[in-house]
Amino acid sequence: MLKSYLALFLILVQESVCQAWSLPSYEQLDNWLARAGGNTGSGTRWNILPGPFYTPELGPGIGGAVAGQYRPSSDDTVSQNSTLSFSGYVSATGAAGINLSNYAFFAQDSCRFFLDGSVSDTPTYYYGQGFYAGERGSHKQKYTSQALTLRPVIYRQLTGHTYMGLGWVLDLQHAAKSDNSGPLLIENTPQGQSVFSSGVSLVLTLDDRDFVPNPRTGKLADIRLTRYTPETGSDTRFDEYTLHYSRYHSLSNKDVLAWELNGDFTRGNVPWNMLPLLGDNHRMRGYYEGRYRDRNVVSGQAELRHRLTWRHGIVGWLGAGTMAPSLHETGHRHWLPSVGIGYRFEFSPRMNVRLDYGVGRGSSGFYFQTGEAF
C-alpha cells in the first residue's frame, strides 16, 4: 500500500519540481507500480491504487480502488477481457461507502453478466422534486443517506452484437439523522424516510464496444424497462424506462471522441429517492448529486480524450440536460449546461483513474473516480 502511495505521489509531482532533483525514470515508476499491483504486462493480475478525492456531495476524502482483468475460460478467443473492480472511500463529511462493478464475458461472448452495486452512509441534502426545488438552495433538508443498491443483469446473444438481458434492481434507502429544524421535505413524501424498491428489468442491447470499461471504438444502444411491484417486494408500483446511446470514434492512436444521449422516464407511484437525477459523477458533472431530480430527465455530452506521454491523459467535455414532471414537457423546460476538463492516469492497461473538474450553472466540483465517465 505504501508503494502505491509513493508511486502516485512521484507521478503527480514529476514535471513540476525543480530540474535539479534526480527523479526516477518512467521505467523505474513502471517497476514500482508493477510491484504495487499496477503491472502493464500481459498477465492477469489485480491492481491496487489509493488516492484522494473530492466531490460536491462528499467533500474531500481518501479512497482506494482494486481492479482486475480476467478470462473465465482460457479457451475463449472471442470474448474481451472480463473486469472486476471494487472501490471504497471515507470523507471529511463523515461519508463512507463501497462500490462494486463487474463485467464478465462467457462462451465466445454469447453470454454476459454485468453487476453494479454499492453500500453507503452519506450526509447529504434533499431539495425536493423539479427544477425550481433545486434552484432554491435554502429550501432543503439535511439527512444521512443509508443506501444499498444492486443491479445484476444476465445477457444472452440474439445475433451479432445484439443481446437480450434479464435483470433485477434492488434499492434500499433510509433517511437517517434528518434535520427537523427546517422544512420536512422527506417526511412529507408519501413514502417517508424508509423506501424499499425491487423490480425486474428487461433489456435490449446493441453493443460492439471494443473494451467496455474504456472504449476506443464502437457503440452502445440500450433500451431498458424496469417494473417495480409489490409482487417483487417493492413498497410501491411504478415503471422506469431508460434509453441510452453512446458512440466512440478513434480519431488517432492518441485521440478518442466519445458522445452519448440519455433518457430516464418514469410513471406510476415513484418514490422520492428513485426519481431520475440530473447530475452525478458520470453525467452532468459539476452539479450536486440529488439537487435536480424529476420524473423525466434527458441529457447528453461529448468528450474528447487525448493520451499524452507515458500513462498520462487529458479530457474535455461539453454537456447539457433538462427535466420535467411529464413526458410531453421534456425538452421544453430549462436546460442546464455542463463543461469541464479532466486528467487521466492509466494504472492498468486500458483502466484509468480520473480526476475531473466540472462546472455547471452556479456550481462546480472535483471528481476522483476509477474508469471513464461513460
Put a short name on every predicted segment.
Residues 94-98, 119-121, 144-150, 170-174, ...:
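Transmembrane beta-barrel architecture of outer-membrane proteins
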Residues 52-63, 88-98, 108, 194-195, ...:
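Solvent-exposed loop/turn segments connecting transmembrane beta-strands
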Residues 85-87, 135-140, 184-191, 227-233, ...:
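Extracellular loop and loop/strand-boundary signature of outer-membrane beta-barrel proteins
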Residues 201-204, 341-347, 363-374:
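Outer-membrane beta-barrel "beta-signal"
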Residues 21-23, 34-44, 72-81, 107-112, ...:
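Short loop/turn motifs that connect adjacent beta-strands in outer-membrane beta-barrel proteins
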Residues 48-50, 84-88, 113-117, 164-166, ...:
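Membrane-embedded beta-strand positions of outer-membrane beta-barrel proteins
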Residues 190-193, 200-308:
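C-terminal outer-membrane beta-barrel translocator/porin domains of Gram-negative envelope proteins
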Residues 38-47, 54-192, 294, 352, ...:
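Gram-negative/organellar outer-membrane beta-barrel architecture
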